[in-house]
Each structure stands twice: as structure tokens, then as C-alpha cells.
Amino acid sequence: MSPSYWLAGETPASRPALHGAIRADVAIVGGGFTGLWTAIRLAESEPALRIVVLEQAFVGFGASGRNGGFCEASLVHGRANGERHFPSEVDRLERLGRDNLRELIAFIHDHGIECDLEETGVLTVADEAHQVAEFHEWVTEANARGDRLVFLDRAAIQAEVHSPIWQAGVMAGPDDAVLLDPVKLCRGLARVATDLGVEIHEGTRTVSLERIPRGVRVRTVDSSAERDESFGIGRRLGLPFEPSALGQALIGSADDRPASGTVQAGHVVVATSAYSGWYPRLAGLFVPVYDYVLVSDPLTAAQHEAVGWAGRQAMSDANNQFHYFRLTADDRILWGGYDAVYHSGNGIGPRYDHRPETFERLEAQFLRAFPQLAGLGFPYRWGGAIDTTSSFMVTFGQTMGGRVTHALGYTGLGVGASRWAAGVVRDFILRPDSELLGLEFVRSSPFPFPPEPLRSVAVNLVRRELDRADRNEGRRGLLLRALDAVGIGFDS
């Protein structure tokens, strides 16, 4: 079964696994958006660098190929979250985010990347009465800062997209969000990176990093036989389950199989996001949270007329446990979100990719929004892990004496924010005096997650409190207010 609709029917490009010992200026672990953008931005800045990308499965296998294709300008998961954490920088971060989205779109056009880009803007809808007044306040405050949001009352929102439950909406333009096919973008980035001289090795699992004089030794094994959705340490060892992230780290560190490849690199970039459990130094910074998605059959002309949606905007609702939805290039509806499921021990693996109870819940919620589409089939359904920090923003750092740089924790914003983060990673390696590295946003680290079993208890307790707030007109209980007060921002 395909990891996502975007990958269905696709045969991933086969790039050889790494065998033997090589040297590189920079080794990048991870062939998703963060890894590919970092490779490109480094190569553009210093064409003489030898850069290698080491990907465990294939380019776009992880979150980069399983998301909804929403490419947003935000770096901080909303103005309110940015103000909570970085009040003195939030205006600049918003400008940087919009500049980044503009530059990303220009890059797509300049390099001829065909990724079904749709610059249609984003529409947020209210399905609860209390949200209508909040929308008025949101639009008033944002437009006073120079934004160009448009408030839509019930009649106006129904004219855009027909649903009996939506009471108001806020429209933002394509400078806030665009839609695209993330797998096509990934493949386009891989092509550009290769044209710039970057070497990409797929089916190459990184199992350890070792500090050596003037660099880091990266040890890899050939994982090409595990390049379908069932890959994993558990499968390789013949176990009936995938170990937790901690277990994977312990197994990896104890793995005495001969390395199929080694890279002696001046710098290493860890760009594995939710799959970063292999590098234990990052264990407290993030949790992998599973998000689930449905994609429908193509709409008939009559079904399309029944829902409207002529503007083809990206859409989401405004609940804590929110849904996101969109039309695909072939006129299917993608509907995802709501459940955000954490598995104990930073659990990650193919056994979590399909969750029937969540798919049933999503389908029922879809029919509540679009009862006129009863009977519409959903042939594609999948899940994937999102790397989440306690601040709901990407975090940066360096280990091994500055030789290893990481960026992770996008919390759903990685399609767009990964390009900006790649610029920060480039500056860590090439431009230590960069203004970006002086941002508190870049220098600070989020509040760490506690170890197990407290981690599971805390994450799942917060999920229940968010659900309670949604059922209580958005009013946050004592726990959520306390977390807000100490700068720990949680959402779905």
C-alpha cells in the first residue's frame, strides 16, 4: 500500500545506496524537504562543496511525501503563538516567512518544477458561534498591522463553499499560503540538487555519528531492501514490531554489522525530522505525532456544483483539534487532521500509518461538513508522523563541537518553513556572522519534553484538554492556561 495519495502509482527514482568510504564537506542525513533545501542552499552559496544526502528509504518517503500539500508563510504557527514566545521578533518573523514563501514560489517557476502549484490563498472557517466574534477581532487586529484579511459572514462563506455548519470565514491571499503536490516538489528539488552537483544516496540508513579530528564520521548500512512502507529496524531484525525511538537508538548503537558505507565529513546536518530518534541527543526536543488524511474519488460535475469551491482555496477550521482540506489537481477532496496521536516512547513505524478508527471519524466529520456528498468514496487513506516541539515551531542547534547541525519540529509547517530553516542551517555552516543566527527564535530551544512514562501521560492529557476546550466554546481549562503562561504552546 502506498504511503500516500501523492505517491500512489509512482515509482520512486532509484538512486544507489552508499557503499564504501567517501569524503565530503557536508553530509546531510535525510532526503526530505529539509535535507534537499539545505543541499541546494549550500551548493548555491559554495559550488565547490562536496555535498552528499543520505536517505534511509527514498526521497520524499517521510512527512515530505505524506502531508496535505499546504505551503504556508508562517514560521511560528500563527501570530498568537509567535507573540507568546518571541514578542519582540514576531513582526520580523512574519516578514521573513512571507519573503520565504515568495522566494520559494519564484524558485519553483525559475527551475521549471511541475508540482501543481495553485496560488489561491487560504480560507479559515468557523463552525462554532463563539468563533464568529473571534474572527472579527482577528481581522480587525491583523488589518491594523497592514494585513489584507477579509471577513466573510455566513452568506459570504456559503457563497464560496457550501456547508451547513460554517458560520463565518476569514480569507487570506496567496502571500499567506499556496497549494502544491509535495512529492512532485520533492522530486523537483532532488533534480535541482543533482544538477548542482549534490550526490543523493537512497536506501542508506545512517546508524551512527562519531566525532573525529576536523569532522565527523558517518556510518551507514544499506537499507535498500527495506525501501517500501514496511522498512524498519524491527523488520530487519525479524521482530513482530517496530521498536520505539529510544529502542531504535539503542539497537543502532549496538549494531555490529559491518558498515556498508562511511562518510568522513567536515559537517553533518541532521534533517530527519520525526525520524530523528536514531540520534539520541535530540530525544527530548520533539515528539512524533501521527496525523491522518483521506482523499476522495474525483468529484463529478454535479458534486462540484453541490459544494461550490470555485476559488479552490486551501481551507481549515478554527478548532484546537482542527481539520484541513483542499481540492487536488484532479478534483478530489483531501480531508485531514483532528486526531493527533502520540505513541509511547516516541513510537514511529509503519504499524501506525493506518488507523481505522481515525479514518472512520474523519469520514463522519467530512459528511457533517458536506452532507450533500454522501456516498463519495475515499480510496486513499494514510497517516504520517509530524515532528512537534513544545513551542510548535522549528528549533535549531549544534552538537559535537558545532560539527553537527539540526533543524526539526516544524509541527506541520515544514513544506514552506523547511526552505527558510535550510538557510539558517547554511548560515551555521558557512556564515557564522549571519543576522539570522542572532535571532532569539534561532538561538533559543523549546521546553524539553519529559522522559517516559511522563511524556505519554503529559501529551495525552493535553490532547484531552484540547478536546474539552473545543466542546466548551474554546474556553481553555486550568492546565492549558498554565502551559500558556510558561510558554508551552499546544494545539492539535
How should each PLM-predicted stretch be described?
Residues 66-96:
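Glycine-rich active-site loop/strand segments that organize a redox cofactor
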